[in-house]
Amino acid sequence: MGATETVDLFLELINDDNREQAVNLLAENAVMGISVPGSDERTNLRGRDRVGGWFLRAGDGFRMYTNDSRNMGGSYIADVTVMRPGAPSMHVEANFRVEGGEIVSLFLQPLSG
């Protein structure tokens, strides 16, 4: 599976509340960076358990919808709306790196405006 197919399946599983299956698409050594809105700070998670745990703890109703995307070979960059019950939706740039059908890195950065 290429980057587009892998990320599309990952998001489909997230949005269908099949987060455990989505986590299986993460590489064992996956890395995730999450930028804090309005700050220069970033949270970094390493390993499938920690990165996957972030998605597993998101709770029912957590959704990630792609508004626009581009495939850059092994990278997939998307403009994504993140929705979570009880919280305002966020507009982020999601940068996925895929190798051998597994997501090896994911970086989420809030988009302004």
Question: PLM ranges: what are they?
Answer:
Residues M1, T43-L45, G86:
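Alpha-helical interaction segments
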Residues E28-S69:
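A solvent-exposed, acidic/Ser-Thr-rich amphipathic alpha-helical stretch
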Residues M1-E20, N24:
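Short, low-complexity N-terminal intrinsically disordered segments enriched in polar/charged residues
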Residues F10, Q21-V23, A30, G47, ...:
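Hydrophobic pocket/interface hotspot
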